[in-house]
Regions:
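Structural signal for hydrophobic packing residues in well-ordered secondary-structure cores
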Residues: 17-24, 43, 96-99, 142, ...
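Conserved active-site and cofactor/substrate-binding residues in soluble primary-metabolism enzymes
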Residues: 8-11, 26, 30-38, 55-58, ...
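Nucleotide and nucleotide-moiety/phosphate-recognizing core
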Residues: 37-118, 124-148
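Generic, low-specificity signal for short hydrophobic/alpha-helical stretches with a mild N-terminal bias
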Residues: 2, 13-17, 21, 49, ...
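An N-terminal, well-structured beta->alpha segment
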Residues: 1-49, 225
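YjeF_N-associated NAD(P)HX repair module
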Residues: 2-11, 113-225
Length: 225
């Protein structure tokens, strides 16, 4: 446990999401919406949102909708939008209904910030193909990089960086800090690490044996570690 709350593993993240829905009626859609709001607050400039194909992408797409409203959205790209499903696919459709063109080409025109929503806590091997190419492009973009949960390419449990991995300036980790952010390559790649509240009930964590201080977010809904 660090000074501001326990660390959480990728397996516990998955279990918490399932338990929140099945036991407590907290839909993944709601958590994704809260995540998007928090992420957008860290993007202070024209933002390119780079999405993968999982729930991490959904968080990025939700953030894009807020950035659009705030006049800070430069563009949105998804490695393979056809693979999105569930809440992430709903976020994609919402953006398209608002007239946002979600392309399969990552462009950095007008980019002051890149929101890295390519990989989240589930990665277990080195990125390949377009995933790897996009990570390398982000690192070469010259823009400030904000990563969702962990920098893409970083193992969220061990902190070991696969090649390639995103070099973030800021990492916004959702709910609780991920174990890999504090070990091995994690501190080097993550930049500033902020923990952001997305509304996950502490009772969910308690069911998994994770003790969260009840005052974790009492002073503010995000904090730096």
């Amino acid at each position: 446990m660090n000074s501001r709350g326990p660390l959480i593993s990728s397996a516990q993240v998955k279990a918490a999401d399932a338990l929140a829905h099945e036991r407590f009626g907290i839909a993944t859609d709601w958590l994704m919406e809260a995540a998007g709001w928090q992420l957008a607050r860290f993007c202070n400039g024209g933002t390119v949102v780079a999405c993968g194909v999982g729930n991490n992408a959904g968080d990025g797409l939700a953030a894009a909708r807020h950035l659009l409203r705030w006049g800070r959205l430069a563009s949105v790209a998804c490695v393979d939008a056809g693979r999105l499903h569930g809440p992430a696919e709903k976020e994609l459709q919402a953006l398209r209904k608002l007239g946002v063109d979600v392309t399969g080409t990552l462009l950095f025109e007008g980019a002051e910030v890149v929101l890295d929503a390519i990989f989240g806590t589930g990665i277990s091997r080195a990125p390949e193909g377009n995933f790897a190419a996009w990570i390398e492009a982000i690192n070469s973009s010259g823009a400030r990089v904000v990563s969702v949960d962990v920098p893409s390419g970083l193992d969220s449990d061990t902190g070991v960086a696969y090649a390639p991995s995103v070099q973030a300036h800021t990492t916004v980790t959702l709910g609780l800090p991920k174990a890999g952010l504090t070990s091995a390559d994690g501190p080097r790649l993550a930049g500033e690490v902020w923990v952001a509240d997305i509304g996950m009930p502490f009772e969910v964590y308690a069911e998994l044996g994770i003790v969260v201080p009840p005052t974790l977010f009492s002073a503010q809904d995000r904090f730096r570690i």
